[in-house]
């Protein structure tokens, strides 16, 4: 009886591994450039490339199976913002736009869904919101 249970567990583990391999495996994300100055309340756009198995730029894993990277950032208070990336014309290249609601340090990562291998980057330092421009007096 125990032997049958172990066999079932082994078969299920092999099937799960096979499904992950057929789904495209894993990927890494490389940024176009280091983040510049970021201010709370202003959109920040980041460009990056998804490299399947760390080498090949990839937009999709086959018909009906697009790569859909998700940027997730969290601050020390636990506040979370997300941005779904959109593909550009260059294979494997994406851009995401996110607006941070407050200043401070934000931990952030990009998940190259449905591929495994989230990429965690150095924390972002978000500056205080810029003062609103004074309205013209008429």
Regions found by a protein language model. Give the residues of each.
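Bacterial N-terminal signal peptides that target proteins for export
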Residues: 1-8
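Bacterial N-terminal signal peptides
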Residues: 8-17
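N-terminal soluble domains immediately following signal/targeting peptides that reside
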Residues: 20-138
